[in-house]
């Protein structure tokens, strides 16, 4: 995959997300290597938990932790690692871990991909049980890994998500 050819934004309201980890997959953390374009196994998680949503990143962005902006894509189906999916950001999970701030953008597929998410415009439109599952996952997925921890500090709205995405794009443009 030539990541250099994939833009961060498809248009003003749509972001491109490169999937690293499919929803409900085994307890394996994959990471996309930007130089080779390959998906590597980062580690086998010690907890027997699976990601509640498809997990990936926005290309050509840089978050406060030095990695691309992370995204959880709410969908009905697992998406193959390395796939690019067009999404709309609807909110953000605010959290910290042993490396610092580590926010997760919450996004849904665009109408062209799946019209069943058209009603979700803001984080408040996302199912409460799914939000609880997301929080539970991130509060516990590192529990058995020595020296690792996560603290979920809350949820923020679409405006905050959009702001974090823009900041991530600007960091890369200044490099």
Swiss-Prot record:
Its EC number is 3.6.1.1. Mg(2+) 2 binds at residue 70. Keywords: Cytoplasm, Hydrolase, Magnesium, Metal-binding. Mg(2+) 1 binds at residues 65, 70, 102. It is found in: Cytoplasm. Pfam families: Pyrophosphatase. It is an enzyme of class 3 (hydrolase). GO terms for biological process: phosphate-containing compound metabolic process. One of its GO terms (cellular component) is cytoplasm. Belongs to the PPase family. Homohexamer. Catalyzes the hydrolysis of inorganic pyrophosphate (PPi) forming two phosphate ions. This is Inorganic pyrophosphatase. The lineage of its organism: Bacteria, Pseudomonadati, Pseudomonadota, Alphaproteobacteria, Rickettsiales.
């Amino acid at each position: 995959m030539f990541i250099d050819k994939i833009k961060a934004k498809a248009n003003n309201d749509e972001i491109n997300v490169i999937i690293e980890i499919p929803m409900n997959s085994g307890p394996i953390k994959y990471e996309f290597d930007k130089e080779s374009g390959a998906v590597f196994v980062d580690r086998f998680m010690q907890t027997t938990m699976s990601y509640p949503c498809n997990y990936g990143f926005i290309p050509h962005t840089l978050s406060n932790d030095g990695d691309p902006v992370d995204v959880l894509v709410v969908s009905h189906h697992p998406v193959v690692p390395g796939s690019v999916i067009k999404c709309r950001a609807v909110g953000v999970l605010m959290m910290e871990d042993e490396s610092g701030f580590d926010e997760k953008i919450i996004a849904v597929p665009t109408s062209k991909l799946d019209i069943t998410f058209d009603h979700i415009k803001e984080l408040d439109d996302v199912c409460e049980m799914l939000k609880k599952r997301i929080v539970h996952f991130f509060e516990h997925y590192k529990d058995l890994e020595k020296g690792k921890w996560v603290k979920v500090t809350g949820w923020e709205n679409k405006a905050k998500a959009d702001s974090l995405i823009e900041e991530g794009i600007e960091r890369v443009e200044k490099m």
